[in-house]
Each structure stands twice: as structure tokens, then as C-alpha cells.
């Protein structure tokens, strides 16, 4: 049975390197499923929960991906992301604190009507919520 080789790479190194039968990612245009034999492509990714169905019914892995790009070349899938964490590596307490900080920063930015700070806080909040969601899986 054909399978994908999936690597998730960040500036800190390889975060995930396994075989899979299916991966699901989210682009600005919506969700995309990648199966073995998928057409070659390069696409941008948004902050999302990447679902990886391991080969031979070995289970499902979840990875919190914070933007980046996906490249599919034959059956090799490479995700290059700003940051990424596997569900088992996420410290939920730390993620909750990051969410609270982002909420406070967003509230402050809205009060002062600072658009740049508001956007940064919104991104930080999306990332924290994504990490919490993946960490609970």
C-alpha cells in the first residue's frame, strides 16, 4: 500500500518525521486532504490543527501548525512552518497563559485603537487557542 512520508520542519529543526496514509491541512482557501499519489503542489498554510493518519492504522497524530507552507512532491510531504508542536509536546498550562496574555494585549490594543498591536494580539490569540485545542487531543 502506498504511503506518504511527512516531515514538519521549523527554524528549530524537524518536529515530525513519519509515514502516513492521509494528512489534512488548512490553507487560506480551505481544508485540503493529501493522499498518496497526490498531485505535486506548493501552498501557503494558516494557523491550524494538522491531522496525520499514520500508516497501517497506527492511529492519528495531531500537530499545531502556526502558518507556513506545504510542499507535496510525489509522496514526500514537507511542511515548513514558523513553529509547530505535536499534541503530546504541548504544555497546556503554558498555552493557557499565552492565551490570557494575548487576550489582555488585544483588549489594550482595542482600547488604544492601535491596529498593528491588535493584529499581533489576534495572531497570538489564534496560535494559543490552536495549541490548546491540539494539546487536548
Swiss-Prot record:
Gene3D superfamilies: ATP synthase delta/epsilon subunit, C-terminal domain, F0F1 ATP synthase delta/epsilon subunit, N-terminal. Keywords: ATP synthesis, Cell membrane, CF(1), Hydrogen ion transport, Ion transport, Membrane, Transport. The keyword Phosphoprotein does not apply. The keyword Cell membrane applies. Coiled coil: none annotated. It is found in: Cell membrane. It is a peripheral membrane protein. One of its GO terms (cellular component) is proton-transporting ATP synthase complex. GO terms for molecular function: ATP binding; proton-transporting ATP synthase activity, rotational mechanism. InterPro entries: ATP_F1_dsu/esu_C_sf, ATP_synth_F1_dsu/esu, ATP_synth_F1_dsu/esu_N, ATP_synth_F1_esu_C, ATPsynth_dsu/esu_N. Produces ATP from ADP in the presence of a proton gradient across the membrane. Belongs to the ATPase epsilon chain family. F-type ATPases have 2 components, CF(1) - the catalytic core - and CF(0) - the membrane proton channel. CF(1) has five subunits: alpha(3), beta(3), gamma(1), delta(1), epsilon(1). CF(0) has three main subunits: a, b and c. This is ATP synthase epsilon chain. It comes from Streptococcus agalactiae serotype III (strain NEM316). The lineage of its organism: Bacteria, Bacillati, Bacillota, Bacilli, Lactobacillales.
Amino acid at each position: 500500500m502506498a504511503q506518504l512520508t511527512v516531515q514538519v520542519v521549523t527554524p528549530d529543526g524537524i518536529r515530525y518525521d513519519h509515514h502516513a496514509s492521509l494528512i489534512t491541512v488548512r490553507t487560506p482557501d480551505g481544508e485540503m486532504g493529501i493522499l498518496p499519489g497526490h498531485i505535486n503542489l506548493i501552498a501557503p498554510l494558516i494557523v491550524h490543527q494538522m491531522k496525520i493518519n499514520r500508516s497501517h492504522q497506527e492511529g492519528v497524530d495531531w500537530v499545531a501548525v502556526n502558518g507556513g507552507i506545504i510542499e507535496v512532491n510525489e509522496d514526500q510531504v514537507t511542511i515548513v512552518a514558523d513553529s509547530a508542536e505535536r499534541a503530546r509536546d504541548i504544555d497546556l498550562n503554558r498555552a493557557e497563559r499565552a492565551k490570557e496574555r494575548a487576550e489582555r494585549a488585544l483588549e489594550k490594543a482595542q482600547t488604544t485603537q492601535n491596529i498593528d498591536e491588535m493584529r499581533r494580539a489576534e495572531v497570538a490569540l489564534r496560535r494559543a487557542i490552536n495549541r490548546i485545542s491540539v494539546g487536548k487531543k
